[in-house]
Amino acid sequence: MVIKAKSPAGFAEKYIIESIWNGRFPPGSILPAERELSELIGVTRTTLREVLQRLARDGWLTIQHGKPTKVNQFMETSGLHILDTLMTLDAENATSIVEDLLAARTNISPIFMRYAFKLNKESAERIMINVIESCEALVNAPSWDAFIAASPYAEKIQQHVKEDSEKDELKRQEILIAKTFNFYDYMLFQRLAFHSGNQIYGLIFNGLKKLYDRVGSYYFSNPQARELAMEFYRQLLAVCQSGEREHLPQVIRQYGIASGHIWNQMKMTLPSNFTEDDC
């Protein structure tokens, strides 16, 4: 297998995960002893130990003192964060994972948004107004750099929106605009989820963040997708302000259908790095 990684720990993690996925260390099997495995991968035992602990926390492995490390049935023991990893392992099924994400968001949003609009109306309105104004400023700015220079939240945005090594300035601007728009889209859903009064909804979005960023950074490279999303945000705000929460399911469902149509077009020309791991 060909593995690209930025650090020995990253290499070891990818090696073990890909070995589990490809059947070299199948679910239910026992991993080689620590010394043997560290020599096989080419990392120190200290590095390997740290990686094994992290993989155990993520549900890939079971580590018990005095017993061999066991490979789990990871689809039964892992959380939502595994979805982004599955994108990198199973590129052929990447689009179905995206569609599952979009469908799940459409299904749960009417529930938590209804509670957010009822229990924390003013906070919900502030979030949506902030997102709408920020997204309008972003798409109307002459460039991403100009938007950042004028934004009072520039430092926070740059903590979350990372630049890559794109040399073409036009492509760089397009990439950063898409990533920043996705930053606001995620903010709207995640914060409304927490304002529902049920922290589980917010934690669901936390668990999906890496996958959400991967998908949104591509999806929102489409100006049509950005315009559709902003109109959706405005409709949500209108529902919240009017108190007519019974309209939420229809508004969200219509957006889910329309955004699904855009995705169905975009998935035909996925970029080569769409399923690449960034670790």
Curated annotation (Swiss-Prot):
Where is it predominantly found?
Answer: cytoplasm
Is Transcription regulation among the key words of this record? yes
Alphabetical UniProt keywords: Activator, Cytoplasm, DNA-binding, Fatty acid metabolism, Lipid metabolism, Repressor, Transcription, Transcription regulation
Pfam family, any one:
FadR_C
Name where it's found: Cytoplasm
Q: Which GO terms describe its molecular function?
A: DNA binding; DNA-binding transcription factor activity; fatty-acyl-CoA binding
Which residue range or ranges hold the HTH gntR-type domain? Answer: 6-74
Q: Which InterPro entries match?
A: FA-response_TF_FadR (IPR014178), FadR_C (IPR028374), TF_FadR/GntR_C (IPR008920), Tscrpt_reg_HTH_GntR (IPR000524), WH-like_DNA-bd_sf (IPR036388), WH_DNA-bd_sf (IPR036390)
What is one GO cellular-component annotation here? cytoplasm
- The Swiss-Prot or TrEMBL record marks DNA binding at 34-53
What's any GO biological process attached to this entry? fatty acid metabolic process
Transmembrane domains' residue ranges: none
Q: Which SMART domains match?
A: HTH_GNTR
Going by the entry's taxonomy, the superkingdom of the source organism is recorded as Bacteria
Quaternary structure, per UniProt, is: Homodimer.
Question: Which PANTHER family does the protein's record reference?
Answer: FATTY ACID METABOLISM REGULATOR PROTEIN, TRANSCRIPTIONAL REGULATOR, GNTR FAMILY
Stated role: Multifunctional regulator of fatty acid metabolism.
The cross-references to HAMAP family, in alphabetical order and at most eight, read:
HTH_FadR
UniProt-recorded name of the protein = Fatty acid metabolism regulator protein
- Which organism is this entry from? Vibrio cholerae serotype O1 (strain ATCC 39315 / El Tor Inaba N16961)
Organism ancestry: Bacteria, Pseudomonadati, Pseudomonadota, Gammaproteobacteria, Vibrionales
Q: Which gene encodes it?
A: fadR
